[in-house]
């Protein structure tokens, strides 16, 4: 009887799969039952190399560009990775293994990790793809019931290989070219170039240049207190004829650029009566979109000071270890259109108030009671979901999290619930007080109507 080899990206994922499918016995670094052999990589095990690089060590323009006709693979230098690669190759070549399942992370890098291993093993056994959006046992079993055909993954494989090879070409040629340029007058000044690091460094450099060339300018603002029958209110002088200046962001309607001009406004208006006009407009504020990875990282940085790397690590832990969030490495802020029932069940679970959902349970219950989960293009849109959908909580509510994990889980859950509430209706009011030909603006806003939505959810 032949078996299928499942290769996950991390040992922890392999362990979760073994628990979800059941019946496995552990044999060192792999698991086995009557149907499957199950093991994992430990991240990237192989790296690209150019065969017989003829100009290694001769970094001059005469030997550029370096474009190999093909790329070879070489094991990384880490001993643990080398040992794991040997084991996986041995498992792939087992005579009783007739097929493979790629269970690496559902994304470009996960695809590349598996493809490199299979290529290095020199085997072309039939392959299927396990595509996990959540790490709960039910989600794992459901994903095994809907394995993807290998042909459907070819575009993702091509994208992954192209990215890796482009990185190599840009890095090798760019680094050698810039090093040769900076060393042309003698010496050796290695200048690394990379697809990501170089444009990122350019952003930092541009910002630093802007700071260094900034010329401070003094400006004045005139503020006034007005006495009315209902009480005292403040206004700020503005130029009613102001127009934005395209190349000078410091020009604003309330700024006066000479002290004399500011004092003349004060002298003209002090203790003088004013004529008031007022305009009010309704404004509807919907909840912010669901999180993708980038927006989650920005929110966590702004609220908690977490770095992008820290937030990703926490979200990955909530996904893999706690099974509390869906796949975090996503660039979509939308959910599939067939996800309505899953969302309803998830919100119903949060409404029970168990574990980490205790504080927000009443809000989840309000959504369920009012039937607010329904088709909505702001939330459910297949056209805006690619490989993965937005980051949302799963039906597995955690009971114990670290302080940092709890913070990330909390903002994801609140963003998830808030989007199902109706918009808040605000009334924005602009009051203009005209005194001796000078205009003073007073702005205010008040909630006209709300379903106890954004303010109360985010204050829990």
In which residue ranges do the predicted regions lie?
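Hydrophobic (often cysteine-bearing) scaffold residues that line and stabilize catalytic clefts
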Residues: 13, 109-113, 158, 162, ...
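Intrinsically disordered, low-complexity regulatory segments
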Residues: 1-172, 372-373
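An acidic- and aromatic-residue-enriched active-site/binding cleft used to recognize and process polar
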Residues: 9-11, 41-43, 105-111, 132-135, ...
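Long, highly charged, low-complexity internal segments
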Residues: 37, 45-79, 90, 188-312, ...
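Catalytic phosphate-handling regions of large nucleic-acid enzymes and associated NTPases
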Residues: 3, 319-347, 376-395, 423, ...
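Extended, well-ordered alpha-helical scaffold/bundle regions in very large, multi-domain proteins
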Residues: 306-372
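C-terminal or mid-to-C-terminal helical accessory/interaction module adjacent to the motor/catalytic core
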Residues: 140-219
């Amino acid at each position: 009887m032949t078996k299928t080899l499942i290769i996950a990206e991390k040992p922890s994922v392999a362990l979760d799969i073994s628990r979800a499918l059941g019946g496995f016995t552990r044999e060192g670094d792999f698991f086995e039952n009557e149907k499957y052999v199950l093991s994992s990589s430990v991240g990237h095990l192989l790296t690209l190399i150019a065969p017989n690089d003829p100009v290694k060590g001769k970094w001059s323009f005469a030997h550029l560009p370096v474009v190999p006709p093909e790329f070879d693979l070489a094991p990384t230098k880490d001993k643990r990775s080398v040992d794991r690669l040997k084991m996986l190759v041995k498992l792939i070549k087992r005579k009783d293994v007739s097929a493979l399942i790629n269970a690496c992370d559902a994304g470009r890098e996960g695809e590349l990790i598996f493809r490199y291993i299979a290529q290095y093993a020199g085997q072309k056994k039939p392959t299927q793809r396990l595509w996990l959006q959540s790490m709960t046992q039910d989600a794992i079993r459901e994903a095994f019931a809907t394995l993807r055909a290998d042909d459907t993954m070819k575009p993702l494989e091509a994208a992954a290989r192209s990215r890796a090879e482009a990185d190599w070409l840009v890095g090798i040629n760019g680094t050698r070219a810039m090093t040769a340029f900076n060393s042309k007058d003698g010496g050796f000044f290695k200048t690394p170039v990379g697809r990501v690091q170089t444009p990122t460094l350019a952003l930092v450099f541009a910002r630093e240049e802007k700071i260094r060339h900034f010329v401070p300018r003094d400006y004045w603002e005139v503020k006034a207190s007005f006495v009315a029958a209902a009480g005292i209110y403040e206004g700020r002088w503005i130029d009613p004829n102001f127009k934005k200046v395209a190349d000078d962001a410091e020009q604003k309607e309330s700024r006066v650029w000479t002290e004399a001009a500011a004092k003349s406004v004060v002298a003209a208006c002090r203790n003088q009566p004013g004529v008031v006009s007022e305009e009010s407009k309704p404004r509807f504020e919907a909840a912010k979109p669901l999180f993708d990875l980038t927006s989650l990282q920005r929110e966590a940085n702004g609220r908690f000071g977490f770095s992008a790397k820290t937030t990703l690590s926490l979200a990955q832990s909530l996904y893999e270890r706690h099974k509390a969030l869906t796949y975090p490495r996503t660039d979509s802020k939308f959910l599939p259109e067939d996800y309505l029932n899953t969302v309803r069940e998830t919100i119903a679970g949060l409404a029970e108030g168990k574990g980490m959902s205790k504080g927000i349970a009443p809000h989840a219950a309000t959504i369920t009671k009012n039937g607010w989960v329904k088709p909505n293009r702001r939330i459910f849109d297949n056209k805006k979901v690619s490989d993965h959908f937005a980051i949302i909580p799963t039906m597995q509510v955690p009971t114990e999290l670290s302080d940092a994990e709890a913070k990330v889980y909390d903002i994801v859950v609140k963003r998830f619930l808030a989007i199902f509430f109706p918009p808040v209706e605000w009334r924005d009011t602009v009051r203009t007080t005209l005194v001796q030909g000078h205009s003073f603006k007073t702005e205010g806003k008040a909630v006209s109507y709300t379903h106890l939505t954004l303010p109360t959810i985010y204050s829990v």
